[in-house]
Amino acid sequence: MSAFSEAALERKLSELSNSQQSVQTLSLWLIHHRKHSALIVSVWERELRKAKPNRKLTFLYLANDVIQNSKRKGPEFTKDFAPVIVEAFKHVSSESDESCKKHPGRVLSIWEERSVYENDVLEQLRQALYGDRKVRKRTYEQIKVDENNCSPRSSPTDPPQTMDLIRALQELENAASGDAAVHQRIASLPIEVQDVSLLDRITDKESGEQLSKMVDDACMLLADYNGRLAAEIDDRKQLTRMLSDFLRCQKEFLAEKEHKLEVRIVLF
């Protein structure tokens, strides 16, 4: 894996695209160099503010991937991102157009589900995205009002629009679990990276370095695929929630129309 430097990080951030592969590849590189986490976060924030509006959301996705996938190796990134992440969310939200503003909220929802940060940080993030429109606690009566207000005239976020569902389904057509090429690459990994008994074959420094490189390449491949699978699981959970909300509201809408039709029949 390439050596770390501030210039190398700046270059990689400038080349970052919004593809899942690009985000996860850079995330793995950053996690590998996590001893530089403070500098990485500083450069990330600086480059985020310099990035064009259509690239800012990708920086947030990168931070999400790094924070979540580095936790099992150490708290460095979670701790170093904490002082800047609220302002970063505000910045991305303010610079995004209306169609993209829901995406930071999706990242926040995942962090809430997984308790990525303490409640006080999550509350600050909620305030950064929603202001006073989304309070932390609601009464039972308020929740029931929200549930009963679902109709075709409701906000576009409740329920999801048909095009949002179609888009989510289309994105899953290229999901990691269906990537035959990666399946084949994993199946074709050399036996040397799977069987520890073959370590006895190492007879000199050169053969040891060759094996080390094979293991590193295999780890990169598997870590990348694991990250893609984790993202796919999140996408499928989100789609399940969207479908559930959509079906519930459609049933309520149908029941409302049937009731109105019955009233008309009685009147006539």
From Swiss-Prot:
Gene3D superfamilies recorded: 1.25.40.90, 6.10.250.2560
Keyword match Membrane: no
Keywords, ordered alphabetically: Nucleus
Gene Ontology terms, MF aspect: RNA polymerase II C-terminal domain binding; RNA polymerase II complex binding
GO biological process, one term: RNA polymerase II promoter clearance
Domain CID per the UniProt entry, residue ranges: 1-133
SUPFAM superfamilies to which the protein is assigned, alphabetical: ENTH/VHS domain
A GO cellular component entry from the record: transcription preinitiation complex
InterPro entries recorded: CID_dom, ENTH_VHS, RPRD1A/B_C, RPRD1A_CID
Subcellular location: Nucleus
PANTHER family: CYCLIN-DEPENDENT KINASE INHIBITOR-RELATED PROTEIN, REGULATION OF NUCLEAR PRE-MRNA DOMAIN-CONTAINING PROTEIN 1A
Subunit structure: May form a heterodimer with RPRD1B. Associates with the RNA polymerase II subunit POLR2A (via CTD phosphorylated at 'Ser-2' and 'Ser-7' of the heptad repeats).
Family: Belongs to the UPF0400 (RTT103) family.
Biological function: Interacts with phosphorylated C-terminal heptapeptide repeat domain (CTD) of the largest RNA polymerase II subunit POLR2A, and participates in dephosphorylation of the CTD by RPAP2. May act as a negative regulator of cyclin-D1 (CCND1) and cyclin-E (CCNE1) in the cell cycle.
The protein's name in its UniProt record: Regulation of nuclear pre-mRNA domain-containing protein 1A
Organism of origin: Gallus gallus (Chicken)
